[in-house]
């Protein structure tokens, strides 16, 4: 039985583990959190920091690993690609290529090189240089973000120099690699697209509207169809294929978050790792393709042509909606709209009544998974912010 090293074992990796088992792999998970839900489904757990690429490489050598699968974290993707390059394991980008898709400052450099549309930005690896740049700024707002963190961590919108100075210091403090970006603030419709690239061509695509709730830099809700997507599809697909060819990427998934302003997409960030929030469940339901199997097989360097042949146009619209509290405090009750309840195909509750929320901006209470028909879309878009209620004691 071939051995797979999967670089984490959180809730986000549970479906990956089940899929790997179904495909015949002996699964070894890593990570720092032994309590992660996914570890109990693995054949073996080896504690190892997935953000430490050298440690992951050493673990893979020690365990005589056959294939490595990145987890739903940018650090995990980088470490997986690094170890695979060193060991000659297929299915992954070169490490230096991977950095263009998982480190925000490297992405900006690639965007500039390829003339891609993205908010203007400056990037820094020294605090004093970043502060000098802030002092030279003549317009606000700006966005300050660590170059290496995902999930909205450390991102701040700043409206004056004092706010920018504080945000820059905080971003440097949070960044593991001690690099940050200061980026022009773009206001528009946030969307996301996940594509499968085969031989440098987009052969499968899935675009969503991405909404925020209380935290403007964390996706709370993602659901197709993306507004006015057909008007920008040609540009996005051409740009993805330009990136794929220029950086000679391996076959597999590529996800881009972007903002549409005045009918033009502005690319914010990219990733080639597995998505969190079990988003692949939604994509699989709508397209007829098992995205988890597609991800595992591509990470293992296997052909995916047979799976891709099952893809069909969207006939339903599935998405996830995270549940957050409106403030810090103790949860008294959680209510879900009865009509919306009838659209759910899964519910994952992490906490409930009696739980004390200490950071309502990031402390997710649970996630609702739903499927809509075309006739539901108008109702859903009108009511989506009122489909659950968290009451605090």
Regions found by a protein language model. Name each.
Residues 181, 250-256, 306-311:
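Flexible, glycine/charged-enriched surface loops at secondary-structure junctions
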């Amino acid at each position: 039985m071939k051995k797979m090293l999967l670089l984490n074992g959180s809730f986000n990796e549970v479906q990956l583990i089940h899929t790997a088992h179904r495909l015949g792999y002996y699964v070894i998970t890593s990570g720092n959190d032994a309590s992660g839900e996914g570890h109990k489904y693995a054949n073996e757990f080896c504690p190892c920091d997935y953000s430490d690429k050298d440690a992951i490489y050493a673990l893979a050598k020690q365990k005589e690993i056959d294939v490595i699968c990145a987890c739903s974290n940018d650090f995990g993707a980088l470490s997986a690609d690094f170890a695979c390059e060193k060991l000659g394991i297929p299915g992954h980008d070169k490490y230096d290529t991977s950095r263009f898709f998982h480190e925000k400052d490297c992405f900006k450099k690639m965007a500039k090189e390829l003339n891609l549309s993205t908010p203007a930005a400056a990037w820094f690896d020294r605090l004093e240089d970043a502060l000098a740049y802030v002092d030279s700024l003549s317009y606000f707002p700006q966005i300050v973000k660590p170059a290496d963190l995902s999930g909205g961590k450390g991102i701040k919108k700043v409206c004056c120099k004092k706010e920018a100075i504080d945000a820059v210091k905080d971003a440097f403090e949070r960044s593991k690699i001690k690099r940050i970006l200061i980026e022009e603030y773009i206001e528009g419709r946030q969307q996301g697209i996940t594509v499968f690239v085969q031989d440098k061509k987009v052969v499968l695509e899935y675009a969503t509207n991405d909404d925020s709730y209380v935290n403007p830099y964390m996706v709370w809700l993602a659901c197709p169809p993306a507004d006015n997507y057909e008007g920008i599809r040609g540009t996005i697909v051409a740009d993805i294929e330009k990136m794929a060819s220029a950086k000679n990427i391996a076959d597999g998934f590529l996800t881009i978050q972007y903002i549409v302003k005045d009918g033009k997409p502005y690319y914010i960030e990219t990733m080639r790792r597995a998505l969190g929030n079990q988003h692949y469940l939604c994509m699989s339901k709508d397209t007829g393709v098992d995205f988890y199997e597609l991800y595992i097989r591509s990470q293992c360097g296997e052909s995916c042509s047979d799976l891709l042949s099952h893809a069909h146009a969207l006939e339903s619209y599935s998405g996830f909606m995270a549940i957050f509290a409106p403030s810090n405090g103790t949860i008294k009750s959680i209510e879900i709209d009865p009509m919306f309840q009838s659209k759910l195909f899964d519910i994952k509750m992490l906490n409930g009544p009696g739980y004390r929320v200490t950071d309502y901006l990031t402390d997710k209470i649970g996630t609702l998974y739903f499927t809509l028909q075309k006739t539901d879309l108008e109702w859903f878009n009108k009511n989506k912010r009122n489909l659950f209620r968290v009451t605090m004691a």
